[in-house]
């Protein structure tokens, strides 16, 4: 699993039938800043994920990849490799609060 920030959406009018009705979002993975371990920073990479929790633009989310992405009831029969499974409220690392959704 990893943390990511929702950066956008993907619309595909031509796709396999099993993906019809599923929201696709772009996300940028986050990591602890190696120069300032009190904050999260983007990695510069982009992933497309199926959203199973109703996430929105700018939210910090929890992502699973690979076979784990197909273990939710919503995705078990989908050809996906990355799934949003949670919207993050807080992140604490080494006793420090790195993220709090209430203060963003």
Predicted regions and their residues:
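Short, structured beta-strand/loop micro-motifs enriched in basic residues and often containing a Trp
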Residues: 39-47
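Short, surface-exposed secondary-structure boundary micro-motifs
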Residues: 9, 30, 66-67
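C-terminal structural segments of small proteins and small subunits
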Residues: 62, 68-104
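Short aromatic-glycine-enriched beta-strand elements
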Residues: 19-27
């Amino acid at each position: 699993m990893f943390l990511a920030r929702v950066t956008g959406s993907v619309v595909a009018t031509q796709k396999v039938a099993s993906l019809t009705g599923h929201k696709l979002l772009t996300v940028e993975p986050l990591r602890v800043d190696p120069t300032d371990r009190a904050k999260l920073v983007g990695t510069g990479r982009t992933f497309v994920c199926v959203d199973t929790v109703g996430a929105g633009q700018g939210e910090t989310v929890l992502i699973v990849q690979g076979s784990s992405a197909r273990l939710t009831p919503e995705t078990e029969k989908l050809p996906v490799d990355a799934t949003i499974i949670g919207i993050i409220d807080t992140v604490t690392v080494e006793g420090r609060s790195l993220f709090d959704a209430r203060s963003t």
